[in-house]
Amino acid sequence: MLPAQPDDQASQCTQEAWTLAFGRNPNVGDARGRAIKAIETLLKPIVSPKNNKATIGSMTNELRQAPDKWECKLADRVYNVNGEINSKRGIEVLIDALATIGYQPDRHGSDQPQDVDEATARSVLFLATTVVGWLRDGTPRTIDSIEK
């Protein structure tokens, strides 16, 4: 499956995000917001189908709190830190991507709005497009849905 499909809210949000990021009149803050909305649209039915107010942050926390509830098609990541071999399960890799995308320093901790850095916002859009593809491809799913 592709990240964009016709007549789909997530596709519309993704297309709007790309236009806002790279169009003639860029607005990278809004581009990042639309990219996040695309993910929320696809992630909500999987993670929080009964929560009408689910956000990327709340759904990331839900995944983080119960990682054993999920099967994820992403490969486990094995890495070396100071000679010590560590591993991260595929679901944790997805959680890290969602946390990276969802973190918006311009929205937290200050009464003064901060400008959105163009390179950062575009990087979020690139990663968000990948996550949209993962979600469309069924990368995360509940263990219960596998057993049925």
Place the predicted regions along the sequence by residue.
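Long, charged low-complexity segments
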Residues: 57-148
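A broad detector of the eukaryotic-type serine/threonine protein kinase catalytic domain
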Residues: 19-22, 43, 107-110
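Non-catalytic, well-ordered alpha-helical scaffold segments
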Residues: 15, 33-36, 122, 129
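Short acidic alpha-helical/loop segments enriched in Asp/Glu that coordinate divalent cations
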Residues: 13, 26-34, 45-63, 142-147
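Alpha-helix capping/termination and helix-coil
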Residues: 21, 39-50, 67, 139
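Charged alpha-helical initiation segments
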Residues: 1-29
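Residue-level detector of well-ordered alpha-helical segments, enriched
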Residues: 9, 13, 30-34, 90-97
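Inward-facing hydrophobic residues that define packing positions of alpha-helical scaffold repeats
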Residues: 14, 35, 42, 73-77
